[in-house]
Amino acid sequence: MANSQRKILVTSALPYANGPIHLGHMLEYIQTDIWSRFQKLRGHECHYICADDAHGTPIMLKAQQMGIEPEEMIAQVNREHQQDFADFNIQFDNFHSTHSVENRELSSDIYLKLRDAGFIKTRTISQLFDPEKSMFLPDRFVKGTCPKCKSEDQYGDNCDNCGATYNPTDLINPKSAVSGATPVMKDSEHFFFDLPAFETMLSEWTRSGAIQDEIANKLGEWFEQGLQQWDISRDAPYFGFEIPDAPGKYFYVWLDAPIGYMGSFKNLCDRREDLNFDDFWAKDSSAEVYHFIGKDIVNFHSLFWPAMLEGAGFRKPTSVFAHGYVTVNGAKMSKSKGTFIKARTYLDNLDPEYLRYYYAAKLSGRIDDLDLNLEDFAQRVNSDLVGKLVNLASRTAGFISKRFDGKLAKVADTSLEQTFLGKQTLIAELYESREFGKAMREIMALADLANAYVADAAPWQLIKDEAKQEEAHQVCSNALNLFRILVTYLKPVLPKLADDVEAFLQFPLTWDNLNADLAGHEIAKFKALMQRVDMKNIEAIIEASKDNLVPAEAPKKADSKKATDTPVDTRPPLESDPISEEISFEDFAKIDLRIARIAKAEHVPEANKLLKLQLDLGGETKQVFAGIKSAYAPEDLEGKLTVMVANLAPRKMRFGMSEGMVLAAGPGNKDLWILEPHEGAQPGMRVK
């Protein structure tokens, strides 16, 4: 283990249970997951917990519109959220719901402790009431003009424009967001948390390093104005927990939502004998608790939440880490432009590891907004992950398998390996401080060194000389060892790739194993690890994300004529297919023939003759549609070497873009044979 073991509890903000996860949400879960996985990789006891935020009027009203009970709706959303997170490789130790037994008990317990300590006040307030729906209006269901900056169409609790918070009654020209009616004032007894009683503690805590300086400076405005008592109750009808000893009164969603962190962890503790709730939440706990949140909810997590914990006798968070918003192509996410992208839409078209890496490459420990530039996204993934990282293995692994029985050599010159290992402390510090972008740059700089080493050593040339076989063996072994170190450094960011590399290397990638000696170790046969991002997949995401009222055109039925219906010509090849007319050498020289490895082969729906091939050129991947379906099953092609025309102009087909042509011989149907080069040929080599 790298250092003494820490006990860490880490959380992400709870997604609201009335809609799907989108790529704006995913920034936070990817950021938290990377940090959590890093802590586990270092050997620490780290628990990453989360839950759906499942209470409030919005959920109650949406369930009514759907004609179902709120419990049914939030259960359905919970399943969808968990599936999206799992498919993005978000590794929660527990994902729960605020509508749970644990959260009800903890919310009541904290409230009663606050009440008994004198921190709960009651008073009658005049509240906005919808006369058409006969209900008091929650903050978010009243809209009007901000009383501070005069921005229109703002919610009743805070202003998106200036960030001010206020009471719904402070709005100018309020309207009910439920019915559109002008609300009337009606008296109601409400419960308040005495936040001003904690002003001294909060002032010190927010300046203690527990939150970022930018956030502490912003919260300073609250202290300048003087903290106010916080309304924690809502009137029936309301979907949530009823306040003890107060029939018809319910906890405001922002009271029980952060308690949901505790509720989810309590649920985990109750299912595991090795976890104790008090070890993490008791006043004298030595464990670390970290909250990752968006900058829009810092007041709840950095003022109300630590004050509630302090007043109820629990420990406060070690730190609250805030991040900025996500923009797409330099602008706010837009449904009309197709840039308001749901997690599921992305997953239907692209590898989640791509987005994990791109977000990591742009994240820092600050609260800056992050722009998802889709062209830059494709270029960075293709350059860094495919061109630099995976290319390192694809260029060298084949020699180990074919020439050296799959076993790695003892490397004499380990100077480059020592350079790689010498970066582990810096990379660990960057992960720890959430400077993921800087960490990615350090790792990719190492990848550049490794690729330059392979290019200079040129094992594909060494392998041709019988006197240099051992040198070639060492170069390839060294390259794969450097590749192992790089993927270990990237394991928190690219967990699926790391799993695949562990299977390929037949060796666990852990921080403690970074300096392992793998001389004589046997590896498995190399398989393609990652494909290039194709802009057509990004275009498909944008198109699927647009608000479009025009029904999609029904897919055309496939031609029912079978490939086997084509008559077979039994004449000799030259008679049935004479040699074409003569061309000049200059014309032939324009054709760039390259060795390619078939990384992936799959059927093309509605195409009787085509297979879709992903061809690895040893640093670049091209997609080709080949008319060889009658002769080959996709699974029989994967891993084979073949010859392709690499500089053929891309051709847009009904099924996608074809970026070249594979060479095959034969009259057709089952009598087709793709060209397969002899052993020693490598992807990317020119055929002369």
Curated annotation (Swiss-Prot):
Enzyme kind, highest EC tier: ligase
Chain span(s) of sequence motif 'KMSKS' region: 332-336
Superkingdom, natural source: Bacteria
EC number: 6.1.1.10
Biological-process GO terms, alphabetical: methionyl-tRNA aminoacylation
Cellular component GO terms, alphabetical: cytosol
Location within or outside the cell: Cytoplasm
Compositionally biased tracts (Basic and acidic residues): 554-564
Required cofactor names: Zn(2+)
The reaction(s) this protein catalyses: tRNA(Met) + L-methionine + ATP = L-methionyl-tRNA(Met) + AMP + diphosphate
Keyword terms, alphabetized: Aminoacyl-tRNA synthetase, ATP-binding, Cytoplasm, Ligase, Metal-binding, Nucleotide-binding, Protein biosynthesis, RNA-binding, tRNA-binding, Zinc
Residue ranges of domain tRNA-binding in the record: 587-688
Positions contributing to Zn(2+) binding: C146, C149, C159, C162
Matches recorded under Gene3D superfamilies: HUPs, Isoleucyl-tRNA Synthetase, Domain 1, Methionyl-tRNA synthetase, Zn-domain, Nucleic acid-binding proteins
Ranges spanned by the short sequence motif 'HIGH' region, renumbered to the chain: 15-25
Annotated cofactor note: Binds 1 zinc ion per subunit.
A GO term for molecular function: methionine-tRNA ligase activity
NCBIfam families: metG, metG_C_term, PRK00133.1
PANTHER family associated with the record: METHIONINE--TRNA LIGASE, METHIONINE--TRNA LIGASE, CYTOPLASMIC
UniProt similarity note: Belongs to the class-I aminoacyl-tRNA synthetase family. MetG type 1 subfamily.
Role summary: Is required not only for elongation of protein synthesis but also for the initiation of all mRNA translation through initiator tRNA(fMet) aminoacylation.
Entry protein name: Methionine--tRNA ligase
Natural source organism: Shewanella woodyi (strain ATCC 51908 / MS32)
